[in-house]
Amino acid sequence: MTNLEEIGARARAAGRRLALMPTERKNAALEAIAAALLDEANAAEVLAANADDVAAGRDAGLSPALIDRMTLTPQRLAAIAADTRTVAGLPDPVGERFDATVLENGLRVHKRRVPLGVVGVIYEARPNVTVDVAALCLKSGNAAILRGGKEITRSCAALTRLIQNALAQTGLPADAIQVIDNPDRALVEQLLRLDRYVDVIIPRGGAGLHRFCREKASIPVITGGIGVCHIYVDQAADLEMVVPIVHNAKVQRPSVCNALDTLLVHRAVAAEMLPAVARDLLASNVELRVDEEAMALLRAAGFDTPQIVPAQESDFGVEFMALILSIRVVAGLDEALEHIARFGDHSDAIITRDPATAEAFVQAVDSSAVFVNASTRFNDGGQLGLGAEIAISTQKLHARGPMALRELTSYKWVVEGDGHVRA
């Protein structure tokens, strides 16, 4: 029987110890985890557990895409090990001092960066998340309680044993990383209410998981990783820029959260831009769901294919996660901004050579990341120079956009005096 109170208490105690660990010790633990992933015996144990999960998934009729996401291979373990070593090489945010000042009364004041404490992470059928989250939490001084999808229970348990062994070998508390290996869904609800021990919940999965966590939690929940992504092609856009940016944003990895969902095109350039974009995307088997004006322009340009279909209004509020793109022709920047304000908050981009229009777009669009003449696919911790990420938050509190090491910390005020008393 899984006792979450015990797990929470052990995590809290381990987190207090971990918060005081020097960077060198934390890095040594991360290096030990990476080495363990590459060790033949350890890898064999993890792969055997994963093979059992995959076999059970196939028997349950899971989709090929889901089976692929949950499958580990020696090559994927090597990539996870490399990512863990990358985290070891990142700057440690814990203990950083900032906003230092000396007050008129002589008090010396600064803020000091500290871990959040205990992080609960609930995720779906991606066993690699087990190690990714563990690495980021360890480096930022946080304990973690992990709950992977029921499809990968064996894989998560095997990876957590490997991590805990590495922690013990390097003198860090093994309870800093724990997994709930019981697939009972009721335990997820219990975790969401474990506010005596857990400081924050980070869900990683689909819209249903995020909604469930928001509705059931008595703990702060940082949601994100879901949202409709837009590109607006301005009348001053460079056609040579438009086609490769749209292609990259839509085609490179259509199933991820920063992939393009809706293309908005200025009416003044739609007749020129749309055929070139459509020709490129159709060659990559993208289905285009277009409004009436876009359909007329594409028909006039000679396009007649079942891959181009009339858009429904509901197609403009959908995160497709597939080779599907909705397209709308707009009168200009104001209409594009109105559309994005209604549907966007994740990753939104403008393609234009006009600096004033670009700045107006950046100022007006209220999303976690806004791009000028660049693909939405760059809304990623690794791509934005953070090294790694635990999630992409679309909230405004506590963090926004890619959440990396610094976003897994808070701060405390430190006030130093010389016998000061308040008047």
From Swiss-Prot:
Principal location listed in the UniProt entry: cytoplasm
EC annotation from Swiss-Prot or TrEMBL: 1.2.1.41
Keyword Oxidoreductase: yes
PANTHER family: DELTA-1-PYRROLINE-5-CARBOXYLATE SYNTHASE, GLUTAMATE SEMIALDEHYDE DEHYDROGENASE
UniProt keyword annotations, A-Z: Amino-acid biosynthesis, Cytoplasm, NADP, Oxidoreductase, Proline biosynthesis
NCBIfam families, A to Z: PRK00197.1, proA
Pfam families: Aldedh
Pathway: Amino-acid biosynthesis; L-proline biosynthesis; L-glutamate 5-semialdehyde from L-glutamate: step 2/2
Compartmental location: Cytoplasm
Name used for this protein in its record: Gamma-glutamyl phosphate reductase
GO molecular function term, any single one: glutamate-5-semialdehyde dehydrogenase activity
Signal peptide from the UniProt entry: none
Source organism per UniProt: Roseiflexus castenholzii (strain DSM 13941 / HLO8)
Catalytic activity: L-glutamate 5-semialdehyde + phosphate + NADP(+) = L-glutamyl 5-phosphate + NADPH + H(+)
Function recorded in the entry: Catalyzes the NADPH-dependent reduction of L-glutamate 5-phosphate into L-glutamate 5-semialdehyde and phosphate. The product spontaneously undergoes cyclization to form 1-pyrroline-5-carboxylate.
